[in-house]
Regions:
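Short, structurally constrained coil/turn elements
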Residues: 31, 101-102
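Conserved small/polar residues in nucleotide/adenosyl-binding loops
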Residues: 105-106
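Alpha-helix capping/helix-boundary segments
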Residues: 92-93
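Short amphipathic alpha-helical segments
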Residues: 18-20, 97-101
């Protein structure tokens, strides 16, 4: 199973949108049993909050539900568990590297 984690600052806009779009694409391809897809934040600012309403609406326009998703912060265990950690921008990548104690991430 391939494990993918999308990461942004607060885990209420970009990374959950990426998570649910990817889940939708994988499901439509009949590959849901081959992937584990999630998202997380580098900060603590939004922990426990739902997906930002405009992001939720945009997903819904495409028939994609993100119901029940709440923001969470990434953990060191995520780095050890997921095959791919995909940062939404360079700042997220830098914060992720600092968070998990790495000086270089590819």
């Amino acid at each position: 199973m391939t494990k993918v984690l999308f990461i942004c600052h607060g885990n209420i806009c970009r990374s959950p949108m990426a998570e649910f779009v990817m889940k939708d694409l994988v499901a439509k391809a009949g590959l849901s049993d081959k992937f584990e897809i999630a998202s997380a934040a580098t900060s603590t600012e939004e922990i426990g909050n739902p997906v930002y309403p405009p992001a939720r609406r945009k997903l819904a326009e495409h028939g994609i539900s993100c119901e029940g998703k709440t923001a969470r912060q990434m953990t060191r265990r995520d780095y050890e568990t997921y095959d791919y950690l995909i940062a939404m921008d360079h700042n997220n990548l830098r914060n992720m590297a600092r968070f998990v104690g790495l000086s270089l991430i590819h």
